[in-house]
Amino acid sequence: GLGHTGGTIDKLEAIPGFNCALDPQAMMEAVENVGCCIAVQNEAIAPADGVLYAIRDVTDTIDSVPLITASIISKKAAEGLSALVLDVKTGRAAFMKTQEQARELAASMVQTAEGLGIQTVAQLTAMDQPIGTHIGNALEVIESVRVLQGEGSPDTRELVVVQGAALLAMTGVSADRDEGRRRMEAVLNNGSALDHFREMCIQQGVEEETAQLLVRNPERVVGTAP
């Protein structure tokens, strides 16, 4: 079924006070104030997706390409995006077990998003083994903070750099992906990416003192297994 492994929202909610249930006005305020936000699908953003999600779970259509496409792209289109980078997993631990299946899904999502006026690329990521070194909501928050600190596992960092570089090139912030890669490496190394994450946490409900501690010593905020 869906929802048993924990998604991005579950991981962020391991941070005390982090509010992912933003309405459209709160999303716009966050983007205006700190340049980014991460929010869960809700009744104001693609309300039909919640219904589709539940239907997929009980009708054995979790891996249906049209339904996956509808679920993912509906939310992106509702946000009014101009550019989108999709990370399509493939391998034993993914819904799409083979590269052929993953390419079919990627093509479906790119075609649908492009048809809605969203400049889109899809990148395939191997999921025959875990990415990074941490598994579990709180632990993956710790690993993510380590990457933002300029450290972290090399494969997780590489995903961030490659996908970020693609988005920078697509939006014209960088001349090409090579320049985008250099810019991504720079913001991870100089701490500015970490600063933006801290500001986003505060904007989305985390106490300032907690956010400050999170970016310095995440284990003290989200905890670790005994």
Give the label of every model feature segment.
Residues 11-21, 55-62, 95-99:
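Glycine-rich tight-turn/loop motif centered on a GG-T
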Residues 23-33, 46, 213-219:
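Short linear loop/turn motifs
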Residues 11-37, 107-113, 117:
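A glycine-rich helix N-cap at a beta->alpha junction
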Residues 6-10, 41-43, 49-53, 95-100, ...:
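Short acidic, glycine/serine/threonine-rich loops at helix termini
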Residues 1-2:
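Active-site cofactor/substrate anionic-group-binding motifs, chiefly glycine-
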Residues 6, 22, 187:
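Short, structured segments at the rim of ligand-binding sites
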